[in-house]
A protein has these predicted regions:
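Glycoside hydrolase catalytic-domain context in secreted enzymes
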Residues: 2-226
Length: 226
């Protein structure tokens, strides 16, 4: 399309419409303006899984926790795809991308349905704590089925495909927001936290970290869970 003149609002209009509500500004500018208007207590309230509403600024409450490791979880009826360990066994990253794309489409629909019912509860948002890209070496760990197995390269490849499928390819808007978890050497059998001390620097950099690096650099994953 064509544009003429400055698209920024006039000073008169700017006085009427806060920057954070003005779509002529970038997301970064709008977010910075919104945060600058918050009190310390309001900022802190946004840093939890259950973020409170800020009525005076028109900010609704939001529940960040949703899951979609192999389908939309806990938010009504949705397609259940094979567990990630099964998807990894196909060695087909194009298939994994297709699965993730279908999941995010359903996520969008379920999000809109929940909002129309006035449902703002947990598991109804567009921020998903998926995929799990931990390295599965020890079968005693009870969450191995959530991962893509023990190989760092395969985990990276599958994880990148999954994130791209979830988040979509629109240059401006996310379809949904993915979250790579759990950073970083999380996937070991242990009765306490001492297990982590057994991870060598070599193992950390060659085995546990490559998938996280790939998802950040190649897939622009929206967030990482510590």
């Amino acid at each position: 399309g064509c544009s003429s003149g400055n698209t920024r609002p006039s000073e008169e209009n700017a006085a009427e419409v806060p920057v954070y509500l003005d779509t002529n500004y970038s997301f970064r500018e709008r977010a910075a303006d919104l945060v600058s208007r918050m009190t310390l207590e309001e900022k802190v309230s946004q840093m939890c899984t259950d973020a409170d509403s800020i009525p005076r600024l028109g900010v609704p409450a939001y529940r960040w926790w949703s899951e979609c490791l192999h389908g939309i979880a806990r938010n009504g009826n949705a397609t259940v795809f094979p567990m990630p360990i099964g998807l990894a066994a196909t060695f087909d990253d194009a298939l994994v991308h297709e699965v993730a794309d279908a999941i995010s489409t359903e996520g969008r629909v379920l999000f809109e349905m929940a909002r129309k019912r006035g449902n703002l509860s947990k598991y109804t948002g567009l921020t998903y704590y998926s995929p799990s890209i931990n390295i599965f070496r020890d079968p005693r760990w009870g969450r191995g089925q959530e991962t893509y197995g023990e190989d760092p390269f395969l985990t990276s490849t599958m994880g990148v495909a999954y994130v791209k499928g979830l988040q979509g390819d629109d240059p401006k808007y996310l379809k949904v927001a993915a979250c790579a978890k759990h950073y970083a050497a999380y996937s070991g059998y242990s009765h306490d936290a001492k297990w982590f001390s057994n991870t060598t620097d070599v193992d950390m950099y060659q085995t546990y970290l490559p998938a996280f690096k790939a998802l950040v650099k190649e897939a622009d994953v929206e967030s990482v869970m510590g």
